[in-house]
Amino acid sequence: MEVCGEPLIRAAPEPLRDERIQTAELLCADLDLSVSLTPERPADRRRRQVRFNVDPVLITVNPEPRNNQPTARKPPNKDEHGVETDREQSRECDGQQTHEAELNTTLALRAELEEEAEQTFDAEKAVREKLQSSTLTKNHVNSKAAEGLNFPRSQQLYRALVSVSLSRDQLISQALQDRPALAPPTASQNNKFSSPPPEGPDILQFYSPDKMLRETPLLPGDHIPLPRPRPVPRPAHTTFHLHRLHKLWES
């Protein structure tokens, strides 16, 4: 209806109030989402605006050190009903399980054992490394070095030394002594008509009469006396027989 061209404005009736809301004790004043039954409000009261935060909540999960005692998980609150899926996705992306038990693994030890089994054993290298790290070997080397360095003054450090101040005659005599003995000459130096040297090696070069051995046969009839030789008579016409044969051969 319009009165004199102006609309008639009626006041809206006051809504029924719930006594339980007034008497009940609210857990949190910020979570009071109670609204009136009708959207209309009296003109003298300001309208209440209710806003909701719809931004997604980003939560980062940091891995915590695992203990032997299992940690108790808290039940999810009502406000975190939309965050559980984000947590599960973040765990899958990280690839880490923070609240689950993990078995002891021996894969690294197995790989090391397989690598050692594939390698060939070098005995010489092992002995060399053992000698380098051996205390007994070091002590033995130190003792030998001490014996070579620590010597009394009365003892000669060097042996079989040769003097450098020698005369010419001493050097010649020493050289003749050190010179190996040569084989004696086959021909005499006093022989004027010396024969030419043979083409082959001389067999008598190493001949020694003292080392010469003679062998005699041992026959079974050695003890039997042998007959004495006697001249055989020849006829007289054979006296110059050989001389005649020579004459014939020469002619």
UniProtKB/Swiss-Prot annotation:
Amino acid composition bias (Basic and acidic residues), ranges on this chain: 76-99
InterPro entries noted in UniProt: PPP1R35, PPP1R35_C
Ranges where the record places region Disordered: 58-99, 180-235
GO aspect biological process, one term: positive regulation of cilium assembly
Gene Ontology annotations for the cellular component aspect, listed alphabetically: centriole; centrosome; cytoplasm
Domain of life: Eukaryota
GO molecular function: phosphatase binding; protein phosphatase inhibitor activity
Compartment(s) of residence: Cytoplasm, Cytoskeleton, Microtubule organizing center, Centrosome; Cytoplasm, Cytoskeleton, Microtubule organizing center, Centrosome, Centriole
PANTHER family, per the entry: PROTEIN PHOSPHATASE 1 REGULATORY SUBUNIT 35
Family: Belongs to the PPP1R35 family.
Function comment: During centriole duplication, may play a role in the centriole elongation by promoting the recruitment of the microtubule-binding elongation machinery, leading to the centriole to centrosome conversion. In addition may play a role in the primary cilia assembly.
Protein name: Protein phosphatase 1 regulatory subunit 35
